Every structure is written in structure tokens, then in C-alpha cells.
């Protein structure tokens, strides 16, 4: 029992150190980077939130969704329309994006989970996402194929202080960082909560979970809805950052991004998708100037990771750490025995 408590405490300390290092790294970006890299770091923060929201259903609940771009897109357009056409705060836009993503996910999940499962469920989510993509592309209100432009970055009013102007300097980057940090914290709490353990049980043994009294359908629908809320928040963060939204954010290839992030970084560990986002975007940025090379490098990296580390980069790191501990174990025990004999 004491050993388990020590391992849990050690894991919590490791995660706290990792989170602090990531936060410090992002905070340092405006100090040394140009505007292009700062924008890339902002996009990485948005994609981290998107990937973690997707991994709630993929890695935690064991469901595959090919249409998660729908919730990102509806959140982005809900926030973008409000910021463009109404005098509202950016927090109202974010809340609208999260609610829109959650509402759409709840509606699609309610239909899809009742009608299909496994591969058929994944295809059904893709079909709904493509329907939304067509709707956005054909609706004048959303800007059709030309996209939604004129999205403002309203200043944040702070009582007793001067307003924080998100349209000047690196204000939008720091706002995105603060919002993403809070959303990542929320995802972390969900992952390690009692409901998170319930979803893990549903993923591993749904029949046994049902026998123990867990409402499997309700648990999956709740997870799917919460995942949609997270994806909607990610889209809402993206709208004022990009200030331009096109129907491509609802296309199938945008739904493939969080899947690639999770497979690359690992689905069984909370920080796996974060590692996947950073490696993916880092490779894409470093090879962007050579036509066709980016896809080759990313594809080869993903193939190598899947073959060498089936659990992703984060899973591979944990596996290597466990192997190192096992190797140190016998030598440490022998040294301890020799010390007692002396």
C-alpha cells in the first residue's frame, strides 16, 4: 500500500514538473521567436486542446470518431459570428463556442450511439461532419467558400486597470495560452476523476461495467458531449486567433488531425496527445519549405513510432523508464545487501 501511494505521488510530481516545463516553454516563445513562430505556438495550443478533447472519447472511452472537426467548426463559427457582428466580450464568444460544440456532439451522439457502434459509429460521425461542411460552404451567413472574415479581437476590461488589448502585440498569444492552460487542467481533472475511471472500465469491459451497474450508453454519451465541449472551446479559441474561418475546418482531413496527434503521442497517457501535437507541428514547420517533404517526414515518423512504440511516444517513454528501473533494481538491491553485511 505504501509503495502504491509513493508511486502515485511520484507520478503526480512528474506530471506537475512536465506541466511547469511546458508552461515555461510557451511563456518564453515571445522572448526569442518571430511573429510566425508565435502564431504557430498559438495554433499548437489550440490543437492541444482539440487533441485532448478528442482523446476523451478515443483513448479514455474507446470510441473512434471520424467527424470531430464538426464540433471544432461549430465552436469556431459560433464564436466568430458573435465577435464579428455583436459587441460582446471574448469570454462570451468562448462560452458560445463551447456550448455549441457540446450541443452538436450531444445531438449527434444521441443518434449515432443508438444506431451504430465500432466502425459504423465512426463512419456515421464522419457523415454528420461532412453534412456540416456542406452547410457551411453553401450558407451566405457563414461566408460560403470565401470564409467568415472580420472577426474582431475585443479588449478585455479589467476592473481597476486599463483594458488588455488583444489586437496589439502578443496579447492574443498570452490570452490563448491562459485559456488553453485552464482547459488542459479541466481535461486532466476529467481524466483522473471517478468518471474517467468509469469510462476506462467501459472501454475495457463494457459488459462487466454494465453488470456492475454502470449505464454504458449514458457514460459514452456524456463523454462524447464533453469531448464536443472541449472541441468547441478549441474552435472558439481559433476564431479570434486566425480572424478568418473557411469551410475547411469542418472537412474530413481536419478530423484526421487529432487522430494523428493521439496515435503519434499515445492514447493511454494523458500527455500523449500533447507530445503528438508538438512533434507533428514541429516536423511540419521545419520541413515546410520543401514541397512534398513534410508529408513524407511526418508519415515516416508516424510509421516508425507505430512499429517501435505501439503506445506512442509517451507510452514508449514510460516503457523505457520502466525498463531502466528494472535494470537498476537488482543492482540497487545487491548494493543494499552488501551494505548491510558490511
Where are these regions (language model features)?
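Transmembrane alpha-helices and adjacent helix-loop boundaries
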Residues: 2-342
Amino acid at each position: 500500500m505504501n509503495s502504491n501511494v509513493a508511486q502515485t505521488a511520484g507520478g503526480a510530481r512528474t506530471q506537475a514538473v512536465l506541466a511547469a516545463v511546458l508552461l515555461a516553454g510557451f511563456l518564453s516563445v515571445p522572448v526569442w521567436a518571430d511573429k510566425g513562430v508565435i502564431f504557430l505556438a498559438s495554433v499548437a495550443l489550440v490543437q492541444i486542446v482539440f487533441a485532448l478533447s478528442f482523446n476523451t472519447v478515443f483513448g479514455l472511452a474507446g470510441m473512434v470518431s471520424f467527424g470531430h472537426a464538426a464540433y471544432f467548426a461549430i465552436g469556431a463559427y459560433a464564436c466568430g459570428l458573435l465577435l464579428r457582428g455583436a459587441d460582446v466580450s471574448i469570454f462570451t464568444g468562448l462560452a458560445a463556442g463551447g456550448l455549441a460544440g457540446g450541443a452538436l456532439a450531444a445531438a449527434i451522439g444521441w443518434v449515432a450511439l443508438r444506431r451504430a457502434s465500432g466502425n459504423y459509429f465512426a463512419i456515421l460521425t464522419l457523415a454528420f461532419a461532412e453534412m456540416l461542411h456542406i452547410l457551411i460552404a453553401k450558407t451566405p451567413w457563414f461566408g460560403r467558400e470565401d470564409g467568415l472574415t472580420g472577426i474582431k479581437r475585443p479588449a478585455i476590461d479589467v476592473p481597476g486597470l486599463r483594458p488588455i488589448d488583444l489586437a496589439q502585440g502578443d496579447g492574443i498569444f498570452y490570452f490563448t495560452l491562459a485559456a488553453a492552460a485552464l482547459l488542459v487542467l479541466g481535461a486532466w481533472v476529467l481524466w483522473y476523476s471517478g468518471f474517467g475511471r468509469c469510462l476506462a472500465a467501459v472501454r475495457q469491459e463494457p459488459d462487466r461495467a454494465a453488470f456492475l451497474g454502470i449505464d454504458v450508453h449514458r457514460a459514452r454519451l456524456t463523454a462524447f458531449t464533453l469531448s464536443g465541449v472541449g472541441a468547441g472551446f478549441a474552435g472558439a479559441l481559433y476564431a479570434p486567433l486566425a480572424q478568418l474561418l473557411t469551410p475547411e475546418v469542418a472537412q474530413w482531413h481536419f478530423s484526421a488531425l487529432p487522430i494523428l496527434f493521439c496515435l503519434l503521442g499515445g492514447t493511454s497517457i494523458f500527455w500523449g496527445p500533447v507530445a503528438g501535437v508538438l512533434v507533428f507541428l514541429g516536423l511540419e514547420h521545419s520541413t515546410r519549405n520543401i514541397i512534398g517533404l513534410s508529408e513524407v517526414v511526418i508519415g515516416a515518423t508516424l510509421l516508425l513510432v507505430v512499429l517501435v512504440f505501439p503506445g506512442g511516444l509517451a507510452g514508449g517513454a514510460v516503457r523505457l523508464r520502466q525498463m531502466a528501473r528494472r535494470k537498476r533494481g537488482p543492482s540497487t538491491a545487491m548494493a543494499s545487501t552488501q551494505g548491510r553485511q558490511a
